[in-house]
Amino acid sequence: MKDEQLYYFEKSPVFKAMMHFSLPMMIGTLLSVIYGILNIYFIGFLEDSHMISAISLTLPVFAILMGLGNLFGVGAGTYISRLLGAKDYSKSKFVSSFSIYGGIALGLIVILVALPFSDQIAAILGARGETLALTSNYLKVMFLSAPFVILFFILEQFARAIGAPMISMIGMLASVGLNIILDPILIFGFDLNVVGAALGTAISNVAAALFFIIYFMKNSDVVSVNIKLAKPNKEMLSEIFKIGIPAFLMSILMGFTGLVLNLFLAHYGNFAIASYGISFRLVQFPELIIMGLCEGVVPLIAYNFMSNKGRMKDVIKAVIMSIGVIFVVCMIAVFTIGHHMVGLFTTDQAIVEMATFILKVTMTSLLLNGIGFLFTGMLQATGQGRGATIMAILQGVVIIPVLFIMNALFGLTGVIWSLLIAESLCALAAMLIVYLLRDRLTVDTSELIEG
């Protein structure tokens, strides 16, 4: 490993190390929002609602591909960080090689299994009439690019795992930048419409994946792309998938939860959907910053879990303090100028009032959300597969029974408060799980290596 990477893992002031790992991730999570709206933004110029719907309907498929990337990216990435903390550099090469080619294999399976059934999958997603063919065409490009999309998510995680978060951010920036350039060229210049939007995203992912591969080949002695090293054993598979599977489940279940929430809101009409949509966009930014903060320090926690428990605890304390500061600043803003913030999106006073109310409720849950993110990251970083699995399932499904109960009792107001109640339950569960696993979080390095 490079001396600079070791410095931030082992010696730099805790806050400096936290920002080194987290700031690029914060920027990256915000970029993901841009990524999500780019295609719709450019397609919007064509003023064809069917095309916009087609792109929107494919989001669950993208979530699945991201989840498959997390299966190896998060699972192997946290394992690699722990191996580096234990100074076991040679084993990390085998782990990375297996994960890279395992991800490519998953992508090829997606092509073989999903591509022939693009029309049927589009129909399952809800595409009808003119939207069906458009959605199917978009999916075909998405499926064909699956190996590179999955590989992109894996390699981005690996860059952070070895202490190179800036490389991770550069890769994401390059991908978004290329997509911004390609979308108008392919959509308008070549008159490819929806297919052009899909190709822009696909080519951007291919380019970013190649960027990461070239970087690792030239600069890393702990991540290998040598297929000869892709030799898994029982221990490797266990360490990767006990964290990778929960990360995969979280990606899938969170998308499902969003779908269920939309169904409840739709019952109250466009007024409710529009109000929630505005508040969601406002809460999304601090939420993504906190998510980036918590996910960014996962490699730092994983590394020091194996080498310096005291530093690991200091990192966790610094993150909690930072979450608290972000929360206080956001609450002050919402309760003083929240009405004006919402007013930037609409002049409809009924929507402004409801969206402001929703904003206050959802922003109140920001602290609890942050605790859930942090403790889930801790469980992933320290290899606590069972705890991570429980948290992944809870974060994905606990809101569903809460929604049914609160909707039956209090209507739309109950649906809104369900968000805070669900976050509270998940945060309490996370704290309980961490407390119950406290002995494992302080186990000696020698015991971990031998086990």
From Swiss-Prot:
One of its GO terms (cellular component) is plasma membrane. Pfam families: MatE (PF01554). It is a multi-pass membrane protein. It is found in: Cell membrane. Multidrug resistance efflux protein. Its main location: membrane. It comes from Staphylococcus aureus (strain MRSA252). InterPro entries: MATE_fam, MATE_MepA-like, MATE_MepA_subfamily, MdtK-like. The keyword Transport applies. The gene is mepA. Belongs to the multi antimicrobial extrusion (MATE) (TC 2.A.66.1) family. MepA subfamily. This is Multidrug export protein MepA.
